[in-house]
């Protein structure tokens, strides 16, 4: 019997909503059975040898173009984290000599664009004006460059690293896209066509690192100048990291079962999908604890979201919100049984996380965690009031609430404490008001979510989303509203790009995690509700990332 049905405190005459979510497709016993052969000292020795060979490549490669390409390939293969010092040394040197008037760079669109993208990606402040030599006196893109497809592709990717107030590359992007699409339709170069089509679907800057690595490893095999050592390192590293992720997933799955939340019939049992979010945000194997905690947070928040969105009455939701604000188990008897289960699961898990941080870092963070949960529950309650009062907010009013109900601000505040040591007073002060490095990715998640899920959610009778609010504000068509949301996503990314090089109390690692969260949302909702409906493309991605190792030929 499900917990919500096992209580005399619930009035059986209440008519409750149902979202008819399908049950999880990932069986507990199946998850616990996951095992990898890619563990142990033999594989560690093998990968250390390969890393040594690649390190030697950094010392041997002196051609500036080859240096850039090596960094780019290592990043796309998902193994650049092994070579951070070597990459930093090369990019630091390139930044120091960036204005030296390199003739090769001025003449090569490809070299200029790749260097610009890599430097911007790694936080170096280089000007967009470096591309002016590729425009004529009328400020139009020089036509002869249209035959340079690799250069055009590199320019397209570079254009997504612009910041607020920059428009040179943005203005030429439509022109570049037009020519790249024509190339795909006409060319017989299979590898380059594959790369162009992939980029046009979603730019590299917006892609999830781990998922991109899995895709690029297969694509790289078809490249004429493929380096066998790089490929071997990437394949082995992917499988070894997958083994770590499997152990993480198994532990999170055991925790989830212990909470009993998976037995709530109205809520989504999406522990695997939440682990996919966590792995997209924090990929590297050494961050196992942080990844597991992020997945647990996501699973809790998915359930609480369903309480407010689907099952709870307005009176019950007000009681639950008050309980979270008080953060006190003594008032739990006022809650129906199913909400007691929910509250205790949140209370115990969050207090344990705070205790871990106190032990490891000497900082009592429970007040910040309590604030995060109170903020999101109050915002959930506001949306519930909109629903019960059949109220359609303006787009501005909607977004002021809905960026919080993505749960991303709450998750990222927790994540800061997981990932950071030492924790600084300056950062704590900033977290109180949700700085832009937290706020902006949350907006992207909200807009991506609405683009992917609003149609299905409206059919279930849910609140209007950003698309419908904009249509109501402006009398726009649905397609016009969708285009506007995509525009807002693009504008927000430009602001994030600037935030990541601005002076900040937050580490580069934390900033990267905040961007990764935005990236996960764009693939999770790219073709619909990848979080709520786990048996489509999400299933294939879970299979590729956590279950199926890359086949490696035995020597």
Residue spans for each PLM region:
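Terpene synthase/cyclase
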Residues: 1-555
């Amino acid at each position: 019997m499900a917990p919500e049905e096992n209580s005399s405190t619930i009035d059986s005459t209440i008519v409750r909503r149902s979202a008819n979510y399908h049950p999880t497709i990932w069986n507990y016993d199946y998850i616990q059975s996951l095992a990898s052969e890619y563990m142990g000292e033999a594989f560690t020795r093998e990968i250390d040898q390969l890393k040594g060979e690649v390190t030697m490549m950094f010392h041997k490669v002196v051609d500036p173009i080859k240096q850039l390409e090596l960094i780019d390939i290592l990043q796309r293969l998902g193994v650049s984290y092994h070579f951070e010092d070597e990459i930093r040394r090369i990019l630091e040197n390139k930044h120091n000599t960036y204005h030296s008037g390199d003739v090769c760079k001025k003449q090569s669109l490809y070299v200029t664009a790749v260097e610009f993208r890599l430097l911007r990606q790694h936080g170096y402040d280089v000007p967009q004006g470096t591309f002016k030599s590729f425009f004529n006196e009328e400020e139009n893109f020089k036509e002869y460059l249209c035959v340079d497809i690799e250069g055009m592709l590199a320019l397209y990717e570079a254009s997504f690293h612009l910041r607020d107030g920059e428009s040179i590359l943005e203005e030429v992007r439509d022109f570049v896209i037009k020519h790249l699409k024509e190339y795909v339709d006409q060319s017989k170069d299979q590898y380059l066509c594959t790369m162009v089509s992939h980029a046009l679907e979603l730019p590299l800057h917006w892609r999830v690192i781990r998922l991109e690595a899995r895709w690029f490893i297969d694509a790289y095999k078809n490249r004429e100048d493929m380096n066998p050592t790089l490929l071997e390192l990437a394949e082995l590293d992917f499988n070894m990291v997958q083994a770590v992720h499997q152990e993480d997933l198994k532990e999170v799955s055991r925790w989830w079962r212990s909470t009993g939340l998976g037995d709530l019939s109205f809520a989504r049992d999406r522990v695997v999908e939440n682990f996919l979010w966590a792995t997209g945000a924090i990929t590297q194997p050494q961050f196992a604890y942080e990844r597991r905690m992020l997945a647990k947070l996501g699973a809790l928040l998915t359930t609480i979201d369903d309480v407010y969105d689907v099952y709870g009455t307005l009176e019950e939701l007000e009681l639950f919100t008050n309980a979270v604000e008080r953060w006190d188990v003594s008032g739990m008897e006022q809650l129906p049984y199913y909400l007691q289960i929910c509250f205790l699961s949140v209370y115990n898990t969050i207090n344990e996380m705070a205790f871990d941080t106190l032990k490891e870092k000497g900082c009592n963070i429970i007040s910040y965690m309590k604030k995060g949960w109170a903020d999101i529950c109050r915002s959930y309650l506001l949306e519930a009031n909109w629903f019960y009062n059949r109220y359609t907010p303006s787009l501005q009013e909607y977004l002021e609430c809905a960026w919080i109900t993505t749960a991303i601000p709450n998750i990222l505040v927790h994540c800061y404490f997981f990932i950071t040591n030492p924790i600084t007073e300056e950062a704590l002060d900033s977290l109180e008001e949700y700085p832009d490095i937290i706020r902006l990715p949350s907006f992207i998640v909200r807009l991506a979510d609405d683009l992917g899920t609003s149609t299905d959610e409206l059919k279930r009778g849910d609140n209007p989303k950003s698309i419908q609010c904009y249509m109501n504000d402006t009398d726009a068509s649905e397609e016009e509203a969708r285009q506007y949301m995509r525009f807002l996503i693009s504008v927000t990314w430009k602001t994030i790009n600037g935030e990541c090089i601005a002076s900040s109390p937050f580490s580069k690692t934390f900033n990267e995690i905040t961007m990764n969260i935005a990236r996960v949302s764009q693939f999770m909702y790219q073709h619909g509700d990848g979080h709520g409906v786990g048996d489509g493309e999400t299933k294939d991605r879970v299979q590729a990332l956590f279950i199926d190792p890359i086949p490696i030929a035995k020597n």
